[in-house]
Amino acid sequence: MGGLEPCSRLLLLPLLLAVGGLRPVQAQAQSDCSCSTVSPGVLAGIVMGDLVLTVLIALAVYFLGRLVHRGRGAAEAATRKQRITETESPYQELQGQRSDVYSDLNMQRPYYK
């Protein structure tokens, strides 16, 4: 099984469980338990049903997402840009390089040059 792709291995697992005739695993200490056991075929069916439902949900989301009108997003982006340009920035704009702010530090510690 080293050469199979992960998808092929995943599809092969329920087949091996159902055809292999594996008995449900029971703990020896709980042999007097009146619990119901789950056969490998039922377990494989649950796993396969879950995988099918997951794929169907993913496909439904994909196709419903494609149906959304794309022009609406462009109109929202234009109004958003307009709102951004109208809003005044609360930050002070940068000024040019000012060497006088840190000039006294160079005189105190010349070994950092």
From Swiss-Prot:
Signal sequence, renumbered to the chain: 1-27
The entry's keywords: Calcium, Cell membrane, Disulfide bond, Immunity, Membrane, Metal-binding, Phosphoprotein, Signal, Transmembrane, Transmembrane helix
Residues in the Extracellular compartment per record: 28-40
Amino-acid positions noted as binding Ca(2+) in the UniProt annotation, renumbered to this chain: 50
GO CC field: cell surface; plasma membrane
Transmembrane segments: 41-61
Localization per Swiss-Prot or TrEMBL: Cell membrane
Residues modified to Phosphotyrosine: 91, 102
Composition skew (Polar residues), residue ranges: 87-100
Post-translational modification note: Following ligand binding by associated receptors, tyrosine phosphorylated in the ITAM domain which leads to activation of additional tyrosine kinases and subsequent cell activation.
One BP annotation, GO: apoptotic cell clearance
Domain of life the protein comes from: Eukaryota
InterPro entries linked: Tyrobp
Residues with site note (Important for interaction with transmembrane receptors): 54
Domain ITAM residues, every copy: 80-108
Family stated for the protein in its record: Belongs to the TYROBP family.
Assembly mode: Homodimer; disulfide-linked. Homotrimer; disulfide-linked. Homotetramer; disulfide-linked. Homotrimers and homotetramers form when low levels of partner receptors are available and is competitive with assembly with interacting receptors. They may represent alternative oligomerization states or may be intermediates in the receptor assembly process. Binding of a metal cation aids in homooligomerization through coordination of the metal ion by the subunits of the oligomer. Interacts with TREM1. Interacts with TREM2. Interacts with CLECSF5. Interacts with CD300LB and CD300C2.
Function text: Adapter protein which non-covalently associates with activating receptors found on the surface of a variety of immune cells to mediate signaling and cell activation following ligand binding by the receptors. TYROBP is tyrosine-phosphorylated in the ITAM domain following ligand binding by the associated receptors which leads to activation of additional tyrosine kinases and subsequent cell activation. Also has an inhibitory role in some cells. Non-covalently associates with activating receptors of the CD300 family to mediate cell activation.
Protein's UniProt name: TYRO protein tyrosine kinase-binding protein
Organism field: Pan troglodytes (Chimpanzee)
This protein's encoding gene: TYROBP
